[in-house]
Amino acid sequence: MKKVIITPSKLRGSVKIPPSKSMAHRAIICASLSKGESVISNIDFSEDIIATMEGMKSLGANIKVEKDKLIINGENILKDSNYKVIDCNESGSTLRFLVPISLIKDNKVNFIGRGNLGKRPLKTYYEIFEEQEIKYSYEEENLDLNIEGSLKGGEFKVKGNISSQFISGLLFTLPLLKDDSKIIITTELESKGYIDLTLDMIEKFGVTIKNNNYREFLIKGNQSYKPMNYKVEGDYSQAAFYFSAGALGSEINCLDLDLSSYQGDKECIEILEGMGARLIKNQEESLSIIHGDLNGTIIDASQCPDIIPVLTVVAALSKGETSIINGERLRIKECDRLNAICTELNKLGADIKELKDGLIINGVKELIGGEVYSHKDHRIAMSLAIASTRCKEEVIIREPDCVKKSYPGFWEDFKSLSGILREE
């Protein structure tokens, strides 16, 4: 599919929110590190999740697919030291989580990928490799990382403002090493919510880590993961698209959301309420955001970078000025998301100025429409689809298939909510 052509209309109806990609990554990893059989249910087989499944299989996990379930047995994880190739596709989570895991025992591994993945920072791990004399080589731009050796317990100093994925990768790994370890966070920690997800999942699988106010993490060695059955909860980062559409006037009931979730992207509710939208709890695990008199605000992107593109859509149609701050990390995602969402929404008639680490958005009453480009980024494509609900004319989105990275059923769900689109 080269493009979708959307006729502007309000979305109406109920939608089952897809399972959390963040939680699924973590559950698959913990189950694969457990000695015994786990069943992980409510899986959405997006490209990123498939990359993590295949990566853990390469490391020795036995993973069987039964409909939306995974039967995982980690008895043979890292049992052999044969050369391994792990294809991360475009998944930053797969790459950064599995690099340290692959070094639990002496190993020789080649990580490959595509798209923008090779441009995303890995210096945190390179510094650890050098300190521990782990051999490594890599190619600039394209992801082709070769590593050889094993990780040892001890003290790890990690910056908290690059990516929380490095910290999560170490949190998965260090409990399985012989010696005790300590992770010291040397800067302000961004995306704390993702660390909470990791700690919660690790604890569910029987591993204990002491969190000293996110400044350091104390990890006893020689622990083991215990198999369990786990159902993946609904994804707030995907619900954010429908919440935003609701704030802009659509009427959508979002199903399968855990109100007690640790997901950091749940913050989208608080942000939208702060702008003037209203939250309606329809029934258990069912939420709607209702349109209100929307006003500009200040949005700190440091703790919830993934929902910034669609919140920019809402801000573009709110009264007054909205500032997106602390968003420099959005430049090193699947694309430069600050530039992409600014460029494409301005094509539709928005008034957005791009800054080094954020955006200044002056709200307009309506968007016009036109042809835009997804930048092959799933969150940009879905954000532009939500923007179309408030356009006067058709919106043409080029390269829409990129949604398969995280939400393969997005366009079908969009149509099920009375979205009017045709594919070419």
From Swiss-Prot:
It is an enzyme of class 2 (transferase). The keyword Nucleus does not apply. GO terms for cellular component: cytoplasm. Its EC number is 2.5.1.19. This is 3-phosphoshikimate 1-carboxyvinyltransferase. PANTHER family: AROM/DEHYDROQUINATE SYNTHASE (PTHR21090), PENTAFUNCTIONAL AROM POLYPEPTIDE (PTHR21090:SF5). The lineage of its organism: Bacteria, Bacillati, Bacillota, Clostridia, Eubacteriales. Keywords: Amino-acid biosynthesis, Aromatic amino acid biosynthesis, Cytoplasm, Transferase. Catalyzes the transfer of the enolpyruvyl moiety of phosphoenolpyruvate (PEP) to the 5-hydroxyl of shikimate-3-phosphate (S3P) to produce enolpyruvyl shikimate-3-phosphate and inorganic phosphate. One of its GO terms (molecular function) is 3-phosphoshikimate 1-carboxyvinyltransferase activity. Monomer. HAMAP family: EPSP_synth. Belongs to the EPSP synthase family. Its main location: cytoplasm. It is found in: Cytoplasm. PROSITE patterns: EPSP_SYNTHASE_2. CDD domains: EPSP_synthase. It catalyses: 3-phosphoshikimate + phosphoenolpyruvate = 5-O-(1-carboxyvinyl)-3-phosphoshikimate + phosphate. Pathway: Metabolic intermediate biosynthesis; chorismate biosynthesis; chorismate from D-erythrose 4-phosphate and phosphoenolpyruvate: step 6/7. GO terms for biological process: amino acid biosynthetic process; aromatic amino acid family biosynthetic process; chorismate biosynthetic process. Pfam families: EPSP_synthase (PF00275).
